[in-house]
Amino acid sequence: MKRLFFTFLCTAFCALYSSASDTIRILCIGNSFSWDAVEQELAPLCEAGNQPIIIGNLYYGGCSLEQHHTFLLKDAAVYSFRYIKDGVRTPHEGYSLRQALLLDQWDYISFQQASHDSGIQSTYEPYLGALIDSVRAYQPNAQFCWMQTWSYSQDAKHPAFPRYQKSQQIMDDSIQSATLALLLRYPELKLIPCGKAITLARQTKLGDTLCRDGYHLNYLYGRYTAACVWYELLTGKDCRRNPYKNADMTPQQRRLTQQAAHRAGKGL
């Protein structure tokens, strides 16, 4: 009886340890675009794919690399920090970047540029390099990522759209060029090509419908597309084989968005 009880305890402990060690922990230093990409659909995708995940998203609306860097230097408690564990999302207001960095041993930490500056290479430095150095001091073992954001809808009313001649194609090309330059400078960054996935999805029967207001992703399949990219790049699993979908999605919407995310993740 004692032997059986001991065996049970060992099995339970090993299962618990395995679950904890297998958990992926990601921290996004972001804004509303990371809100779209990781806060709603990524956790259910991971659950359906048997991948435990903890998600932290530092949200400050429209935040650029320059602003993030300034906030870190000042230890400014200005973020809304959204913490997602076991599929439960818990927001914490008045959070600082330093607090989030010290909260956990993050496996992945992602950076991104504000959408309005995403295709303008001159806005990236020296702020990204300074952020990488500063964050590395807190989390020396984390894998750093770059979340590529997406271009605006063709009819977007965003005040920064004129920077790209109000052209979705010009904005797409500018983002791709900026991303390439960034990866050449920082080859250690893991690319999360959400922007490419949205572009590919727009080239299907879905058309230019991925955004709900011209720049934020729609709730039905826009966010799902970005989350599928994250899912593939974090887990190495094919999102097309993941059974989860938003309840209101049609089979065609699911198929087209999964294909776009998979192609983007594979660089196709």
For the regions a protein language model found, what residue spans apply to each?
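Boundary at the C-terminal end of the N-terminal hydrophobic targeting segment
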Residues: 18-20
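Alpha-helical cap/lid subdomain in secreted, periplasmic
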Residues: 94-220, 232, 241
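Conserved SGNH/GDSL esterase-like catalytic core that processes O-acyl groups on lipids
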Residues: 25, 36-125
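A generic secondary-structure signal for well-formed alpha-helical elements
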Residues: 12, 49, 234-238
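Conserved catalytic region of serine esterases and O-acyltransferases that act on ester linkages
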Residues: 22, 210, 214-217, 221-223, ...
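Sec-dependent N-terminal signal peptides
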Residues: 4-16
